[in-house]
Regions:
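AMP-binding/adenylate-forming catalytic domain of the ANL superfamily
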Residues: 482-503, 522
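Conserved ATP/PPi-binding loop(s) of AMP-dependent carboxylate-activating enzymes
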Residues: 340-344, 355-385, 423
Length: 523
């Protein structure tokens, strides 16, 4: 087995070096069991790059793509990397308003769509939003085939500048828990630093088999791609997530690492409970993911019933990896923290004045390091985003323990102020999640004339369970020794699943908007 490749400067260099080491090893496996090797993927990417070049794509050309998690999508991203294009991947849940905003702000010259996919016509949507532009981009329907050409006609591979100032190669938009997306600028180097951090923390090996069951257009997609290329192992791609179909596919291909977010853990756990003596995926060595903090109870349930650890991580669009749990961590570390800062990432917990907190003192997470983004597409947002020391203000609250592991405690803006008392929503959510009737929960603050804000718990009922009652909610909070002021005054049992974005993060602002004007009385 070859050594991992952790020092490449560009994504294309990483692919070339992987192909030189192991061209015939499996790389990508799709839902239909089609397998592409590293060498085959490079050859396909070069042909596709030649086709894009014939359309006028070159170094620095902005290209927007909204494509499903497919082999061809991964190859497309590699082909555009070969040319040095500036890629703007868009998650498939975006619609006219968001897609139009991204195309305009990035000044895209080419847009790639899947045509009609999953019951929605993406080609028609893009054609609508570009129709009124002064200089509309070319729009290509990938369902009719992507362009190809002769690799011999390709221009030279773009080089890294001698001054080491890496060029912007990616523009991602924030995942949509706020109303206005922000364009986040990344270089190949910053994305690869995140992927290397993840690979090191999870001790990824050439013998592993990974999985991408989340949208590849999410920043976690290319980050995971880096893991595959750096360590030389394959991944199973899931285009449309169906739980039982995914489990069958993972079993066929011997997947060793799976996950995506807390909701994936609980879905796998639900199937495992139906066959407690028979592992649903015997080859799994761990579940891993991120997107939102996991309740400690999830770790202990998965460990007890599936016999494997949950190694959860912490990242965001601006810094794809910040902290990551490791299979070598203790149970306490895995259950109660988001892991240790990843390789080369600098994480500081700060007071409002910017001074560093003591260990176990709550403060804001501020970040620096090679995995950090280069700023926003709208530069007017940068002054507020970075502090005087150049650290990114994450907006997340956390404590760094004595062992260097980080526990998220909430959001700076997710603090509920009830009668002058600061209440962290996450603390209450972790308590309520432990109740068997709770499938998912969001704790929000709603305007209240007597309290300033009142604490409202919005609960998604666990599959097969009866709805949680108010008295049961109070009892579980009391049993957990929550102070009385933190016990929610209001319980809303949500009709159906809680609203989520493409990475399964609960959209609290939608819940607040839906409930803010609903009459309520505690009398």
């Amino acid at each position: 087995m070859s050594e991992p490749i952790y020092d490449a400067r560009t994504l294309w260099e990483l692919l070339e070096r992987r192909v030189a080491n192991s061209p015939d090893r499996a790389f990508l496996i799709d839902d239909a069991d089609r397998t592409v090797t590293f060498g085959e993927a490079k050859n396909q990417a070069e042909r596709m790059a030649a086709g894009f070049a014939a359309l006028g794509v070159g170094e620095g050309t902005p290209v927007t793509w909204v494509l499903p998690t497919r082999i061809d999508t991964v190859v497309t991203s590699l082909a555009l990397s070969r040319l040095g294009a500036v890629q703007n991947p868009i998650i498939h849940i975006y619609r006219d308003r968001e897609v139009g905003f991204c195309i305009r702000q990035t000044a895209a010259e080419l847009v790639l769509t899947p045509g009609e996919w999953s019951g929605f016509d993406y080609q028609a949507m893009v054609e609508r939003v570009v129709a009124d532009l002064d200089e509309p981009p070319a729009v290509v329907d990938a369902s009719a085939g992507l362009p190809e050409g002769d690799p011999a006609a390709l221009p030279p591979v773009p080089t890294v500048p001698a001054d080491g100032q890496d060029a912007i190669r990616w523009i991602y938009y924030t995942s949509g828990t706020t109303s206005d997306p922000k364009g986040v600028l990344h270089t190949d180097a910053s994305l690869m630093a995140g992927g290397v951090g993840l690979a090191r923390a999870l001790d990824m090996q050439p013998t592993d088999v990974g999985s991408i069951a989340f949208p590849y257009a999410h920043i976690g997609g290319p980050d995971y791609l880096v893991c595959l290329l750096a360590n030389g192992f394959p991944a199973v791609l899931v285009e449309k997530f169906d739980l039982m179909a995914a489990i069958e596919s993972f079993n066929r291909h011997g997947v060793t690492m799976a996950g995506g977010s807390t909701v994936f853990y609980t879905m796998f756990l639900g199937v495992q409970r139906q066959q407690p003596d028979d592992p649903i995926i015997p080859t799994l060595r761990l579940l891993s993911g991120g997107g939102a903090p996991k309740p400690p109870e999830v770790f202990f349930e998965v460990q007890a019933e599936m016999g494997i650890p949950v190694a959860h991580g912490y990242g965001m669009t601006e810094s794809p990896m910040i902290c990551q749990g490791s299979p070598t961590d203790t149970d306490d570390q895995l259950a109660h923290t988001e892991g240790h800062p990843v390789f080369a990432a600098a994480v500081t917990i700060c007071r409002p004045d910017g001074s560093e907190c003591d260990r176990d003192e709550e403060g804001e997470v501020r970040i620096s390091g090679p995995q950090l983004f280069s700023g926003y597409r709208d530069p007017t947002l940068n002054d507020e985003a970075f502090d005087e020391a150049g650290r990114f203000r994450s907006g997340d609250l956390a404590v760094m323990r004595g062992d260097g592991h980080v526990t998220l405690t909430g959001r700076v803006k997710d603090i509920i102020i009830r009668k002058g008392e600061n209440i962290a929503a996450k603390e209450i959510e972790d308590v309520l999640y432990a109740h068997p009737k709770v499938g998912a929960v969001a704790v929000i603050g709603l305007p209240d004339p007597g309290r300033g804000e009142r604490v409202c718990a919005v609960v998604e009922t666990a599959e097969g369970a009866e709805p949680l009652t108010y008295d049961e909610m109070v009892a579980v909070c009391t049993d957990a020794a929550l102070m009385r002021q933190k016990v929610p005054e209001q319980l809303v049992v949500h009709d159906g699943p809680l609203p989520r974005n493409a990475t399964m993060k609960i959209l609290k602002y939608e819940l607040k908007d839906a409930l803010v004007d609903v009459p309520w009385s505690d009398v």
